[in-house]
Amino acid sequence: TNAGIGAKNMAAYTGYTCSAVNMIKKINLALGNVSNLDDGVAAFKAINEENLRALAIFQRYCRNVAIMIINIQTIINASKFVIGGGISAQLVLIEEINNQLHKILENNPMIGKQMIAPPVVAAKYGNDANLYGALYALLLELKEKKQTKMD
């Protein structure tokens, strides 16, 4: 089991293996871009140019995300999974997660027969979704305060 190893081995956690930040760092490290490990533009440029080192890391990352989706799907049976944040603007990401998800189901007939692959899509508002959520929360709070004053 993974019990107790987390502090010593973060790779035991889905939050680590499915971290876009870690994936980008690994790609930049593999490319020798050590001066800016957080350079997402450089990482996705290498992916889109089909750099073999970058692709291997990227495909493993997408496979890990697909596995996480399968695990969640077996519990909640979602109609779709939505990827948000800045990384959701990368169409290659959404395509590869869907690709890895279908590969897993094809290569594991037992799983494939028991579940239908939910579509994985990019969030409508992408990296701005958190801003819309914050604005909505503020508007609700202001409405509540206004209502309280009127009562």
Which stretches of residues belong to each language-model region?
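ATP-binding/phosphotransfer module of carbohydrate and carboxylate kinases, centering on a glycine-rich
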Residues: 4-151
